[in-house]
């Protein structure tokens, strides 16, 4: 890839580089995660734009792993997230950085990310966060089977299951591994628009299950955003 023009993108992470440049990790709609250097950030007026939670249109050039940004334009209003919403936003960025490779497109995840950021600022974001996590796992090759159990039988909403990423769902009481959830929770996660994910106890069960699945794919990596959640609770 020699470069790209006018790509919708979000900043996942940024840090200062040399005297007047910035290194950024971008999540682009068409190309996935992109590492880039932004030269002359202050001179070009990019300082206030290369921030998380601001929709951008960017162009870059370069064939290697680290591109050079050539244009940066704000593509919509930014989101001033606070408290738990900010921690959720950082969480999404962290799992994207951990579970994706550069220049590996994740178009559905990109769409779910954009929706989730908007929900963090305006609404109950938990259903949008779950849909983001599911899309990320699916497009990263870790998709979950949520509508059939390990024996190929349809998941029953009223039944209890233990769910493990390696095996899937098995009736509770037949094994000790995995997270115990209701069939209703699994079916709510499987629903295209996540119907029912705002209601308890489905809401808390879905959160607990997805946390366990994501953590398994992170290996031993610790997320700083989880420390933010704990500090907010304290």
UniProtKB/Swiss-Prot annotation:
**Keyword set, alphabetical order:** DNA damage, DNA recombination, DNA repair
One of the record's GO cellular component terms: bacterial nucleoid
Q: Does the keyword DNA damage apply?
A: yes
UniProt xrefs under InterPro entries: ARFGAP/RecO, DNA_rep/recomb_RecO_N, NA-bd_OB-fold, RecO, RecO_C
Biological process per Gene Ontology, one example term: double-strand break repair
> Its function?
Involved in DNA repair and RecF pathway recombination.
Family classification: Belongs to the RecO family.
Q: Which PANTHER family match?
A: DNA REPAIR PROTEIN RECO
What is the name of this protein? DNA repair protein RecO
């Amino acid at each position: 890839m020699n470069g790209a023009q006018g790509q919708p993108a979000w900043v996942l992470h940024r840090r200062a580089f040399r005297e007047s440049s910035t290194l950024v990790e971008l999540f682009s709609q068409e190309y996935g995660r992109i590492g880039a250097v932004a030269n002359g950030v202050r001179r070009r007026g990019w300082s206030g734009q290369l921030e998380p939670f601001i929709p951008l249109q960017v162009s870059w050039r370069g064939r290697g792993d680290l591109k050079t940004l050539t244009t940066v334009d704000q593509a919509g209003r930014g989101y001033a997230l606070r408290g738990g919403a900010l921690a959720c936003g950082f969480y999404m960025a962290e799992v994207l950085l951990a579970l994706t490779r550069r220049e590996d497109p994740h178009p559905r995840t990109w769409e779910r990310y954009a929706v989730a950021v908007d929900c963090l600022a305006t609404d109950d974001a938990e259903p949008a966060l779950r849909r983001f996590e599911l899309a990320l796992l699916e497009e990263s090759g870790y998709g979950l089977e949520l509508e059939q159990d390990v024996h190929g039988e349809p998941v029953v909403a009223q039944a209890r299951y233990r769910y493990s990423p390696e095996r899937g769902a098995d009736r509770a009481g037949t094994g000790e591994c995995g997270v115990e959830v209701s069939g209703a929770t699994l079916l709510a996660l499987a629903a295209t628009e996540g119907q029912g994910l705002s209601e308890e106890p489905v809401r808390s069960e879905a959160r607990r299950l997805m946390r366990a699945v994501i953590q398994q794919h992170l290996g031993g990596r610790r997320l700083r955003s989880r420390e933010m959640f704990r500090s907010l609770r304290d």
